[in-house]
Amino acid sequence: MPVMPIPRRVRSFHGPHTTCLHAACGPVRASHLARTKYNNFDVYIKTRWLYGFIRFLLYFSCSLFTAALWGALAALFCLQYLGVRVLLRFQRKLSVLLLLLGRRRVDFRLVNELLVYGIHVTMLLVGGLGWCFMVFVDM
């Protein structure tokens, strides 16, 4: 989104939006109502590097933030995957032990469904944040 230079006629009007229009021009003097000392592109040239630097900082910080979130969610996904494998092994051993003791087996259906839904949501978030991260890198 490039910065458009404000034409002289618009910059010399002191209406309700004067503070917005003169944000890059410095303080407005009351004795200077009709004309300003700036040419059309002076404001653009003076603020171009600052605008570019602020834009770079914004995109770079957003990219770092989404990359950190992506890494955390990827680690969470790996932990969930390993946790499910350990929990399934525990469930199998517990079920065999309860069968050998002649007791009723425990129903783990709700726990398993919640774990699968949690992994699914984490996987979707990893994919979406990876896409956001690549969008910020491309900018």
From Swiss-Prot:
Induction profile: Up-regulated upon HHV-1 infection.
Disulfide bonds, paired cysteine numbers: none
Major site of localization recorded for this protein: membrane
Classification via Pfam families: TM250
Keyword annotations from UniProtKB, A to Z: Cell cycle, Cytoplasm, Host-virus interaction, Membrane, Nucleus, Transmembrane, Transmembrane helix
Its membrane topology: Multi-pass membrane protein
Transmembrane regions listed in the UniProt entry: 56-76, 116-136
GO cellular component, one term: nucleus
GO BP: positive regulation of cell population proliferation; positive regulation of viral process
Subcellular localization: Membrane; Nucleus; Cytoplasm
InterPro entries linked to this entry: TM250
Subunit structure: (Microbial infection) Interacts with herpes simplex virus 1/HHV-1 protein CVC2/UL25.
Function: May play a role in cell proliferation by promoting progression into S phase.
Full protein name: Transmembrane protein 250
Lineage summary: Eukaryota, Metazoa, Chordata, Craniata, Vertebrata
Gene that encodes the chain: TMEM250
